[in-house]
Swiss-Prot record:
It comes from Cronobacter sakazakii (strain ATCC BAA-894). Belongs to the class-II aminoacyl-tRNA synthetase family. This is Glycine--tRNA ligase beta subunit. The keyword Aminoacyl-tRNA synthetase applies. It catalyses: tRNA(Gly) + glycine + ATP = glycyl-tRNA(Gly) + AMP + diphosphate. SUPFAM superfamilies: HD-domain/PDEase-like. The lineage of its organism: Bacteria, Pseudomonadati, Pseudomonadota, Gammaproteobacteria, Enterobacterales. Its EC number is 6.1.1.14. GO terms for biological process: arginyl-tRNA aminoacylation; glycyl-tRNA aminoacylation.
Amino acid sequence: MSEKTFLVEIGTEELPPKALRSLAESFAANFTAELDAAGLAHGVVSWFAAPRRLALKVANLAASQPDREVEKRGPAVSAAFDAEGNPSKAAEGWARGCGITVDQAERLVTDKGEWLMYRAHVKGESAQALLPNMVSTALSKLPIPKLMRWGASDVQFVRPVHTVTLLLDDEVLPATILGIQSDRVIRGHRFMGEPEFTIDHADQYPQILLERGKVIADYNARKAKIQQDAEAAAAKIGGNADLSDSLLEEVTSLVEWPVVLTAKFEEKFLAVPAEALVYTMKGDQKYFPVYGTDGKLLPNFIFVANIESKDPRQIISGNEKVVRPRLADAEFFFNTDRKKRLEDHLPRLETVLFQQQLGTLRDKTDRIQALSGWIASQIGADVNHATRAGLLSKCDLMTNMVFEFTDTQGVMGMHYARHDGESEDVAVALNEQYMPRFAGDALPSSLVACAVAIADKMDTLAGIFGIGQHPKGDKDPFALRRAALGVLRIIVEKNLPLDLQTLTEEAVRLYGSKLTNAKVVDDVVDFMLGRFRAWYQDEGYSVDTIQAVLANRPTRPADFDARMKAVSHFRTLDEAVALAAANKRVSNILAKATEPLNDEVHASVLKEDPEIRLALQVAVMRDKLQPLFAEGRYQEALVELAQLREPVDEFFEKVMVNADDAQVRINRLTLLSKLRALFLQVADISLLQ
């Protein structure tokens, strides 16, 4: 069977830069799924994406589906005909579905009876016939939150479509997709190369677009070129470019023909905190800042033009003129803000609402101040520094700089605190109170900063849950999931001796009578334990390991983590499967027991050697393991408990638990309860699969 190359390119107006990669990857995944579902054999499916196009190229595509044999069994012959031999309605309906008459059906004879049978050799459809609908289906499934209409048509897509190219080798596949008739015409760069040209063969893509259209359609190649050229440009001026992947992706999605250029700004602006300058360059202008070998910001930036200019100096000058007013604004705000101390902004916090039922930002500040001090006392941090940082935590929100450049909240608080002569502990805490801001972000570096960061997040969790506005589905307007995970990460990774129960109770207490949800403490703790589940699943832990630990509802995050690691290690032991099964058996036996058990196992009632040996082992283990449990050394404890496998196996093989003698029966059930209690000190091992 001959193999072909298939090309589809959708030419559009400028696509959303932050969605370009996901659109292209989804297009490829959707189309690959269509090929596989249709049974069309194929090679690599390559995707291409530029600001004004999405494209796929399929190598080694089969010319058609393989032929296949179809068999459809019908009703039994006894039910297919009446006494006079006329076909029944069931038989006629089945035959119609197969496209035949009843008398054309074959007979299938087995030892269980005789049935009507339809057999046919179905020729596979050609790729030419199948591909246009596959493209339409793949496009219809793209993750587009908001569709557009254009012109007089009812067609909808992420952006207006101008060209559709469908080529199977050198053949145009006739189709109307997104309201556009397919052709072999593709468009080049807006200002360079040929604005429009024809492509003769699918194999010419994307090289023909590069040579004639001045468009680098290969997204990853374009990104690599920008990165390489930017690194070289920065090195040329003795620096390193800040090529954060998110900005690099966005810039890659904005240009078809990247030309990297270097510009500069006045050195006087370096007196402004680097974070504010970087925010302006990256956030507003999509420029890459440049740092010197000492890590300090240089008075230069790198940007990417979408055109090769005969006079690049003119483009550079234009970008320098654009950024200067923004940097001048930052300088003005910085100088103006420093005329007041941070704490001078406290009264203005009373004018800003945190949440209608929960009060103002000043109310929140007072709670954070108190909770920060309480947490500091629990974790050994400086209480005075923590309460001071809590008091000042939201003051920078009232400054000109943060009002204009919102992403500088926290970091500007740090700079203004240093200017005011606050301790470094307090200043750093103001910056780090929002950490971690996202998955994988750094954690607060000091105990004082940890206290304030936890206090801020716990205040929000307690307040929002306290008025019954917990997250529902995908809606989480107060980012409570992120806040909960942030608290857990700080406590676990910093190994802080905090308990979620008492922490939540303290956060709730500080709200006084404002909260209406009587179950707020339990709701918050359960929510945070649920975030533990998601976190550990992402870390690769099995669901049953997580469930085994959650069964004990441990509310100290550091303790929870130790239990997770212990159970995960326990599962690698040879004895794990047998002991998990034994725990499950014990759990079932105890669940069915209706008689009250003894407080302790009575040695005098033990009859059989296996139960005597198990009772002795359990007693020895209880004494041996108490120090390990007390110190949270759960992994060592489970390794010790693994030694119970043989006496447990022997007990179940040779001892009848439900003996006729009530005293003996209750004593044996008591022994099993003591055995299970040892494992439950760590987790419910019976839940392991």
